[in-house]
Amino acid sequence: MSKSGPLARAKWSLLLLVLAACATAPSSRAPAGPGDPRDGLTAAQLDRFQRGKAVFERVFTPATGLGPLWNNVSCVACHDRPAPGGSGFESDDIEIHASRFDSTATPACNELTADGGPVFHVNATSGTPPRIPPSANLGVGRRTTSPLFGLGLIDLVPDAAILARQGTLGGRAHRLPDGRIGRFGRKASRATLQEFSLEAFVAEMGIEIPTELSAEDGQLTVDFVRFLALPRRREDAAGAKLFAQVGCDGCHVPRLADQPLYTDLLLHDLGPNFQDMCRGQARPTEFRTAPLIGVRLLERFLHDGRAASVGEAIRLHGGQAEDVVRRFERLSPDERQRVIHFVEGL
């Protein structure tokens, strides 16, 4: 036998080991980025995700159903940062909402539907859009475009998990007129992702389903949002500990029914700094705890974008969050920065 025989056999053995490892090793797919589909989808679900994305990016015109009142010409025109399904902070991404609140009336919240509310559009295919009527007890609110990443997980939370947390820091579920629990929207005014997503076609673009957009295209858009991945988060055990220590996790619950949402999906009274408009049973100072999803991708903070930083957003919290803010302020400067750094990484 030649001297090269054992060496050749060793090389072949090494090659076979490498090939076996490649064949049996789990996929090393990179973590999902903003706008990517979540892991574990079937081929059929991935197909619906891609087809839904195409509808999400479709530009509408008056000839294809836009109007007569509208805020923008496509879903992605507002939800575009840093990818389709993201947030928006340009002037044309800001909505104006208005309603009238009177605690002595029944119902207490008048959403001004007879006047074109509660969403007052900035564009009309002809003439001028309705203006907010002058009125006593009027609340006007600005709304930035919130990201849609990971919203499909909210649909997976059972009502019982939301109701079980009622009373924690004064939170309460938003019971809708039909008895269901609201969970979507800044005031938790919609019960399902289906309703929340399809309503946007009418509220933002004046597009009626199924007369101006097919029911199938509407459902594809819902599935696109449902299958959007939760953006990856930065690991920070020390920051997470301080986040819990000051009590932020009392409302921004890290896992609700095992979904990593950082919300309790309850309404909380956040004090006069947050007062603007009512919606359904939600009073002007009450807001659903915002899920802390994709915070690192945001440019402005809070429902109206007034906060330029996470620290400013924390300090504007009042009402049922006052004690939490006080504990945050009692931290050392380094500890406060650690909490901010943690939230910025979510």
Predicted feature locations:
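Bacterial N-terminal signal peptides that target proteins for export
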Residues: 2-13
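Bacterial N-terminal signal peptides
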Residues: 11-21
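Periplasmic c-type cytochrome electron-transfer domains
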Residues: 22-346
